[in-house]
Design a protein with these regions (language model features):
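Ubiquitin-like/PB1-type beta-grasp interaction modules and other compact soluble beta-rich domains
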Residues: 1-64
């Protein structure tokens, strides 16, 4: 399936947001996620299905000083 992750095209086999996070190597990381412009909390990632052509944003917090 073809989706966009952080504005980059990806061909993935994942069907849920949680599976996508694992497939892209983010499992265990503290991240925020959005699907098609809507925030998806960690508690809903396993049940959130990815449609073909989905726009996914994965954001990791940054420390500053």
């Amino acid at each position: 399936m073809q989706i966009m992750v952080n504005d980059e095209a990806h061909e993935v086999s994942a069907r849920t947001l949680a599976a996508l996070i694992d497939e892209l190597g983010y499992s265990g990381a503290r991240i925020a996620t959005a699907l098609n412009g809507r925030f998806v909390p960690v508690t809903q990632r396993a049940e959130t299905l990815l449609p073909d052509g989905a726009q996914v944003e994965i954001v990791a917090p940054m420390q500053g000083g």
